[in-house]
Each structure stands twice: as structure tokens, then as C-alpha cells.
């Protein structure tokens, strides 16, 4: 059974062999591919993988002796913008050119590039990770729908509606210099999600099979394509989160971990709005945020580059006197990310919308107390008062109340964390998820 994966990133295992920087995102893809490869003799799956590469000309297989066939010239046959990278880490790998800076744009040339890859690899099944990418739409125009499995991720049709996340109207509409130069203020970012949602809807309509994991993504995708067969497939997360465990005595008291805050949808501003109420009860509370510091500037030049959301966060931090309370950690690899969780007393997700956020799953695997907005598919991951605490999106008073509740009740926090860990080990069971994926592949092939 030949299965071609269509991914939005180059897997770290491939990047390492090519001597290229690895992405910090989508670590669960590596876990899933490792499960397939470790059981290759039993499952009979011959994997291939293709992914967008911004600088296709700079993508060479010369860094590794294991790549076998070597890279094709820039034009593969008569099709420019695609390269066969060779046999890497047990799979045939292909890179193709795509405008990664403008994911809302669809270019017809993508179809030709993917058609070349499909013709070369000859897959029985094409597994597309994410319906929201232009390359997924292009693939549905190349391969018959009965051979296509799309793994549902964020669902941009719904993200577009939630994107502004209750920010003041004038903040959504304003243009700073950076926004003017990039033609990219908050409202325009929202419009880009609208366009991606249109492509996503068309891609889902062109697929015979959909893989999801929440009641929410099942309901939303059904409205787009009621004829597609829906398969339940939970995610296998990064290995380190299965190996370590949160311990109250090892964490910093009243330290909150927030996994990402560089755009409105993630809702960091909600947590900032909640901080005055939290600080009344726990004045030593601090927030640690993974990811880029979009609020930072240390020079006039950097100040001119700050985006509208970054400036809004910075202004709110100053307004509430949080300059010494909010810390940005930068981009973290899995081990450092795990350590950031473990050093914190609780994890908060305040997103305006999520499907099944990996950050919540990772916190649950570690056995951490979790406070999350009750949005999208989150309630398919945890039950309020059982494995975590939920609050209504945007209700910052409730967010502050639930955080203070966990700070003040160590027993409750530990009970919720233990229950969260038990449930997450079922949801994110690597062996079970691998078996489920294999069953889906066999069903499609038959």
C-alpha cells in the first residue's frame, strides 16, 4: 500500500538529513510517521511525503549519503518548482514550490507540481494534513476523491469568524506603518482566513474521506460535504510529553504558562484583561508565553516594524502595570517547551476558537491543571470540573475566577491534573492511534 503524505512542513527527521532548519510545529506528525515506519513489515505501508519549500532551488540532498537517487534539476521533467529529494529516513521525499508567505493565494501551477509528484510516486492513498492549505485544494484536483483522506485541523471557515477575538473596533481597523507596508492589519488578516476558508470548503468537497477528532470538526465538515466518510483519528503528540510529569513541588508558584500569543485568535489579551482580578488575590502571579515576542522593540527601527496586535498587547501590558509580569520565551523546541510547562503552576488556553489544541493535550499528558476557554472542539478533550476548568470565551471575570480557584485549592488542582493525564493517555495513545490510522488506510484501499 503506497501512501503519500501531503504536509505543510518539512518533517524534522527530513530537515536534519538535508542540513536544513527544523520546524517547531506539528511535532505530532513525526510521532505518527515513526509509528508507521517502526511497524513497516507488519503494515505493508510504503510511505512517501511531499511538502512546500519556499526556496526549492536551495533544497539539496547532498547533505546526506542516505538519499540515494539525488535531487532532480529545478524542473522535474517539464514542470518547474518541484524536486524529488530521494529516499530519506525510509520514505520517498519531494519538495515543491509554494507561496508560503501568502497561504490564502491559490496558484494553478500547484496542480501541475503535485500531479508530477503523484505520477512519480503512484500512491494508492493521498493523506493531506489540513484542509486549509492551497496545496490540499490542488491535490483534490489531481487525485480521485475516493483516494483522498484529509485530516481536519483548524477549519479556517470558522476561524475567520472568531479571529478578531473581541478586540476594540478601532484596533481591528487601524494601520500602523508595518501594517501599511505589508497590507496586513487585523481586519485584512481576518479576510485572508475568509479566503483560506473558501479554499478549505472546496477541498473538503473534493475529498471522499475526512479524519477528525472532535464533535465540533465533525459537525462543521458535515455541512461542507455530507457525503464524505468521516473517520475518527486522534493525534499522537510529541514523545517528551509522555515521558515527564508535572509536580507541584517542582513548579514556580502562581506561574501561568501560555503556549502562544502572537495573533488575536490565541487570546493573550483576554488573560491580560483578567490579570488585575488575579493580582488582587495573588500579587506574585506571572505569565510566561512561548513563541515570538510581538510586543518587543528596542530601537526606533524595531518600533516601526511592530504590528497592530503586538502594539495593542504592549499598550495593555503598560496600562495594567504588567511589565514585570509578562515574559516571552521565544520559539521553543519540544524539550524546552516541556520544561516551560513543568515550571508553571497551571496552563491557560484563552483562545477565541480551537479544534483540539495540542497545547491543551500536552498539558494534560503532563498532568497539569488546565484552564481553557470552552470553544470549538475543546470539550471533546476535557470535561469541566473533571479534567480541567472551562470558561466562556471572552469572560475574563470567569477566567480570573477559575485561575484563582486553582491557585487556592492545591488538592483540586492535583486531582484535575491527574484525571487530565489519565484521559490524555487514552486520547493520545500512540499505539491506538497508529492502529486506527492503519484501519482507515486499509478501509480506503479496499
Please place each PLM-identified region on the residue numbering.
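Aromatic "clamp/platform" in nucleotide-sugar-dependent glycosyltransferases that forms part
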Residues: 352
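Short alpha-helical donor nucleotide-sugar binding micro-motif in glycosyltransferases
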Residues: 118, 339-344
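Conserved acidic donor-binding segment of nucleotide-sugar-dependent glycosyltransferases
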Residues: 384-385, 389-396, 405-410
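Short hydrophobic beta-strand element within catalytic cores of glycosyltransferases
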Residues: 369-372
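Membrane-proximal helix-turn-helix segments that form the acceptor-binding/catalytic region
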Residues: 173-210, 219, 223
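N-terminal subdomain of nucleotide-sugar transferases
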Residues: 1-80, 89-92
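Nucleotide-activated donor-binding/catalytic signature segment of Leloir-type glycosyltransferases, i.e.
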Residues: 301-331
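Conserved donor-binding/catalytic core segment of Leloir-type glycosyltransferases
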Residues: 4, 247-266, 272-275, 287-290
